[in-house]
Design a protein with these regions (language model features):
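Glycine-rich loop(s) and the adjacent beta-strand/alpha-helix scaffold that form part
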Residues: 2-64
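Conserved flavin/dinucleotide-binding core of flavoenzymes
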Residues: 45, 51-185
Length: 185
């Protein structure tokens, strides 16, 4: 083990409560009350975005109904450094980012998080690629999107514990002690 007067753990609380042996019980209990939801960010490298320009958009949102992937996407603004301001030009390459939460209405929040993490990690790259490109054809095919011509690459960022889900009672806690306030001490 490591011995020190003070330790800074630069990991998530879901890890800290299992790794730090002498963590005060109040912290361990507070960390146990957090629920972390998974999230997928898919970055699609495009050779151009003329198909979006024809629609007059740089972003889209849609119903996450049956057969749909994700619920929103947007073009990443080119990086600006110092005085350098690259143009947002539809004939130039860009990245289109898709944001995908995992939720299952009617299920307990912890069960949703666990099920979402399992789906996130068990789904193959090829399956996500199929779903994403299929969604793009559905949304943008009529305006000229062609995956063979317009897609240069795809990167998946799988976040198993992306964000804390504030369930009912989370902010007030029990007996006025909210888990987030205990952790901040």
């Amino acid at each position: 083990g490591v011995r020190a007067k003070a330790v800074v753990m630069a990991t998530g609380g879901w890890v800290n409560r299992h790794v730090v042996r002498d963590l005060p019980p109040a912290f361990t209990n507070a960390y146990a009350q957090f629920v972390h939801a998974p999230f997928l960010v898919a970055n699609v490298a495009l050779t151009n975005w003329q198909f979006l320009y024809k629609l007059g958009i740089t972003a889209a949102i849609w119903d996450r109904g049956e057969g749909n992937f994700g619920y929103t996407c947007n073009i990443r603004i080119p990086m600006q450094v110092g005085g350098y301001r690259p143009p947002l030009d539809p004939s130039k390459p860009t990245v289109l980012s898709f944001y995908t939460p995992f939720f299952y209405p009617g299920e307990d929040i912890r069960a949703q998080a666990a099920r979402g993490r399992a789906e996130l990690l068990q789904t193959s790259f090829r399956e996500y690629e199929r779903q994403i490109l299929g969604q793009m054809v559905k949304l943008f095919g009529a305006s000229g999107f062609d995956p063979q011509r317009d897609v240069a690459g795809l990167i998946l960022n799988r976040w198993g514990h992306a964000y804390s889900v504030p369930y009912p009672g989370f902010y007030g806690g029990s007996h006025g002690q909210a888990p987030r306030d205990i952790i901040r001490q």
